[in-house]
Amino acid sequence: MGSKTFEGEGQRGGNDPSNSTSPNSAGGEPRGAHLSRDGDGSLGDGDGDDGADGDEKDGAVTTTPLTEQQPSSETTSKKKKRRKPKKKISALKQSSPPRVPLDDLFPTGQFPVGETHEYGSVVEGTARTTSEEVRYLSRNYLQDDSVLTDYRKAAEIHRQVRHWTQENVRPGQTLTEIAVGIEDGVRALLDNAGLETGQCLQSGMGFPTGLALNDCVAHYTPNPGQKDIVLQASDVMKVDFGVHINGWIVDSAFTMSFDPTYDNLLAAVKDATNTGIKNAGIDVRISDVSAAIQEAMESYEVEIGGKVFPVKPVRDISGHNINRYQIHGGKSIPFVKNSSQTKMEEGEIFAIETFGSTGRGSTVEGFGVYGYGKDPNAPKKVSSPLASARSLYKTINENFGSIVFCRRYLERLGVERYLAGMNSLVNNGIVEQYAPLMDMKGSYSAQFEHTILLRESCKEVVSRGNDY
């Protein structure tokens, strides 16, 4: 999920992975899919010989010693009873649409490790200071095996759900169908419907599913009261969704197109994201990562309708670090060169993402609302003359906390007549409202994103798959 930056402020308006793109974006078997087919090797009867008994071996010949008494003809004429081979228990595999809980596919609780990169040598003059070491002590959760397990499980769910999305989403479907399909898949694999009080805080969507088309760069999701949009064969669609377990959010995004015209646009943004991942690390200045991203993206151009467009990095959205239950943690990674001296630090979690556009490369807020997010520093209770505001705030605290949510999620919980209360919370700065972000009409934009963990010994691209 892109973080809006301060440089600028509805929908359709007018280890070195390959950068090649296919007509429907980055398809392919997700990392760990073989494990989900095999049930991580722990299911089955354990015979390993398709029903052979005891020490019988396929192709083995048994002989009778000459000194042993030979059986009578009557004995030999009797038909020897053959034992029925044991039925082999078939390994579980993921269904389509994905509905098998991930814990059933990985009964040992061990999930695929993300792609790991060793750190390069530390640049002289950028070694950690004492204050940074103190900050690290307050966020050493990546040393906790349970946190790593939560992250890897959430990442595997993301891979399996996006694999289904890439294989099944086609023009002619509505954006509501697509969003609900993704979200139903995530909840099914988590084995948590999220309908009881507090369940959404245990696990669920990390933020509303983003389905931004063409000149809508980011922050669009179908919501009640809006006209539903039908996906067209000429559309370029950014698919951005998050999965959280115990507040640890995996944020990953990809772009789908159905026309090879846009292949170079997708390739540019994928290359820029992978360049950002390659350059990220402990003690690295964010400005250096930004400069590398810009250089990679601007080396591409795309021809549309006989006209050549440079691929421009979008200047007023950025990558970001992630805190527990907080998708935007405070640090930003712009896609253009800057003079910031802020560094990445050990123990931090980053969403490395890039957006590229054939338009201006900057955005304005569009019509409508994408979602809402409670201020992490907001009080536990609010005093408001509106009973609807007080009731809504209680619902937000019990079900979302500081996780970004949308109107669809409220109505799924059965919340009614909440708009006046929501407006009150927004106007008082307790809840932030997010609008769609638009580039110029007629332009096209793409996005790719991964979540990386800056562990002590390596950076782990936890959301990496065989697709992107």
UniProtKB/Swiss-Prot annotation:
GO CC field: cytoplasm
Binding positions (substrate): 219, 328
Enzyme Commission no: 3.4.11.18
GO biological process per UniProt: proteolysis
Enzyme class, broadest EC rank: hydrolase
The organism's place on the tree of life at top rank: Eukaryota
Binding positions (a divalent metal cation 1): 240, 251, 449
CDD domains, alphabetized: MetAP2
GO MF annotation list: initiator methionyl aminopeptidase activity; metal ion binding; metalloaminopeptidase activity
Localization: Cytoplasm
Keyword Glycoprotein listed: no
Compositional bias per record (Basic and acidic residues), positions renumbered to this chain: 1-10, 31-40
Cofactor note: Binds 2 divalent metal cations per subunit. Has a high-affinity and a low affinity metal-binding site. The true nature of the physiological cofactor is under debate. The enzyme is active with cobalt, zinc, manganese or divalent iron ions. Most likely, methionine aminopeptidases function as mononuclear Fe(2+)-metalloproteases under physiological conditions, and the catalytically relevant metal-binding site has been assigned to the histidine-containing high-affinity site.
Binding sites annotated in the UniProt record for a divalent metal cation 2: 251, 320, 353, 449
Region forming the signal peptide: none
Assigned keywords, A-Z: Aminopeptidase, Cytoplasm, Hydrolase, Metal-binding, Protease
Function as written in the Swiss-Prot or TrEMBL entry: Cotranslationally removes the N-terminal methionine from nascent proteins. The N-terminal methionine is often cleaved when the second residue in the primary sequence is small and uncharged (Met-Ala-, Cys, Gly, Pro, Ser, Thr, or Val).
Family assignment from sequence similarity: Belongs to the peptidase M24A family. Methionine aminopeptidase eukaryotic type 2 subfamily.
Name of the featured protein: Methionine aminopeptidase 2
